[in-house]
């Protein structure tokens, strides 16, 4: 039950980058997760093809949500969450051994290095991305690197939905910022 979205009849996203901000517990991550799951992504993260599950704890909000897309369908996509990144990194390494993804050796790197590697290796034009608090793993310099990568990818037709507390990411030029504070959107 998220007060900020409980009375919503619809929400239209018109910009390539939408940032969700608000206090802890305001429902940002729950809303993002529901959007990602409604779009067909694994609740723990990854691509639409990732079917692993370590703990079934996602919100049922996705069942009450209907996504209506424009005429252009995303060719690729990724759901990247700071809180379940270890599980996604493990899955990425399994897929790397099979030659399906380029992200190998993630557990041998720092959290920030491996997180940025996964993010960068999956950024493609005309794709759909859900990022949940990416700043949790990244230094300010790496946040700027990610911001530039997102900017380039968005300029090539990709759409991003990002939950963040980071003033660096909240400073994204031209992004739509939605606050879930105070029980309203």
Language model features by range: what are they?
Residues 109-133, 141-153:
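GG-anchored amphipathic helix commonly corresponding to the ABC/SMC/Rad50 NBD signature/C-loop
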Residues 25-26:
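ATP-binding Walker
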Residues 141-159, 166-185:
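C-terminal lobe/lid and adjacent interdomain/linker elements of RecA-like ASCE P-loop ATPase modules
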């Amino acid at each position: 039950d998220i007060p900020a979205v409980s009375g919503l009849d619809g929400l239209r996203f018109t910009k390539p980058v939408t940032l969700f901000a608000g206090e802890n517990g305001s429902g940002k991550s729950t809303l993002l997760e529901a959007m990602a799951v409604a779009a067909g992504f694994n609740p723990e993260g990854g691509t639409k093809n990732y079917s692993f599950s370590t703990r079934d704890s996602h919100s049922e909000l996705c069942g009450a949500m209907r996504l209506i897309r424009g005429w252009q369908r995303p060719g690729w996509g990724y759901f990247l969450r700071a809180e379940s990144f270890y599980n996604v990194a493990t899955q990425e390494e399994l897929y790397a051994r099979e030659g399906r993804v380029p992200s190998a050796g993630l557990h041998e790197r720092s959290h920030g290095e491996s997180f940025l590697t996964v993010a960068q290796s999956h950024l493609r034009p005309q794709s759909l991305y859900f990022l949940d608090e990416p700043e949790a793993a990244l230094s300010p310099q790496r946040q700027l690197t990610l911001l530039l990568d997102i900017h380039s990818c968005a300029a090539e037709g990709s759409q991003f939905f990002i939950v963040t507390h980071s003033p660096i990411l909240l400073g994204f030029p031209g992004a739509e910022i939605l606050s879930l504070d105070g029980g309203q959107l």
